[in-house]
């Protein structure tokens, strides 16, 4: 049996070799994602700072020399007016009447239609609204809705706001023209009376009446009403009325005397207090005949 040798304390005992393992794949991917995230974050941050600095430099160069209040006015959005159309009481002041009351005032070959919906006026009970500024006529529903957002006529684009400076001047001119027209009508009435007297006293009055100026014409039926001829215009949006009726309607509207629905039978009465004929068409039957 071999004898065991004593172990020297200074002798090192050999240890088994250690094996080092690589870090797991999850840790590597996590580190890579964190690096990419921080790089992207700082890149976006620096781009935003650069864009902000560039924008301020451009605005300073563009608005250089402009006052601050003007710069703010340019930056503020332009808002539309609260009420771009006419006031409701102004819309309601324009004459309203049924189509049957003016159907006979125009010749049948000329149609009358609404310029908004482009429908011809055929039914007698429909209500029409007349713009006395330009005498264009429309359906009540069409023109009321239009004037709620506009201040001009749909046909001629004339300003209908009575407070506009141009309308105030035109109102003064219309009053002067109406007075001159009334004086001219009085002269025509006196001339008409002289013609009728000469017709009764002379047997050759027919030849004298035919030699009168072309601006006068004799009534086709009774012969007692003489009015001025006006050239016929094919305007399917305009209501052509006799001059004295037009003056009365305009005057009532300018004086804010227009009712909710007017009657043209009351307005076509001539100055002798009797109903007559205009342009060969009977408006209403003569009183007392």
Swiss-Prot record:
A family per Pfam: zf-RING_2
Organism: Arabidopsis thaliana
Gene: ATL30
Broad EC category: transferase
Protein family membership: Belongs to the RING-type zinc finger family. ATL subfamily.
Reaction equation(s) it catalyzes: S-ubiquitinyl-[E2 ubiquitin-conjugating enzyme]-L-cysteine + [acceptor protein]-L-lysine = [E2 ubiquitin-conjugating enzyme]-L-cysteine + N(6)-ubiquitinyl-[acceptor protein]-L-lysine
Name of the molecule in the record: RING-H2 finger protein ATL30
Subcellular location: Membrane
Amino acid composition bias (Polar residues), ranges on this chain: 188-204
EC number(s) given by UniProt: 2.3.2.27
């Amino acid at each position: 049996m071999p004898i065991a040798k004593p172990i020297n304390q200074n002798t090192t005992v050999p240890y088994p070799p250690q094996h080092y393992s690589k870090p797991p794949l999850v840790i590597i991917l996590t580190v890579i994602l964190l690096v990419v995230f921080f790089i992207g974050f700082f890149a976006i941050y620096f781009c935003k700072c650069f864009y902000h600095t560039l924008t301020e430099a451009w605005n300073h160069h563009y608005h250089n020399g402009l006052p601050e209040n003007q710069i703010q006015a340019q930056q503020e959005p332009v808002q539309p007016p609260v009420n771009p159309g006419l006031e409701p009481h102004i819309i309601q002041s324009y004459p309203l009447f049924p189509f049957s009351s003016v159907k006979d005032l125009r010749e049948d070959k000329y149609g009358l239609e609404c310029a908004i919906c482009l429908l011809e006026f055929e039914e007698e009970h429909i209500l029409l609204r007349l713009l006395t500024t330009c005498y264009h006529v429309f359906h009540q529903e069409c023109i009321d809705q239009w004037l709620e957002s506009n201040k001009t006529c749909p046909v001629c684009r004339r300003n209908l706001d009575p407070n506009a400076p141009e309308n105030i001047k035109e109102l003064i001119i219309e009053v002067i023209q109406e007075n001159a027209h009334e004086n001219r009508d009085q002269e025509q009435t006196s001339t008409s009376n002289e013609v009728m007297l000469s017709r009764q006293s002379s047997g050759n009055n027919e030849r004298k009446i035919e030699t009168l100026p072309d601006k006068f014409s004799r009534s086709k039926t009774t012969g007692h009403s003489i009015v001025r001829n006006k050239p016929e215009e094919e305007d399917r949006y305009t209501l052509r009325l006799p001059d004295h009726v037009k003056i009365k309607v305009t005057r009532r509207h300018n004086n804010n005397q227009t009712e909710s629905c007017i009657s043209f039978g009351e307005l076509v009465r001539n100055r002798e207090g009797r109903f007559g004929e205009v342009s060969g068409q009977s408006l209403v039957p003569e009183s007392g005949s």
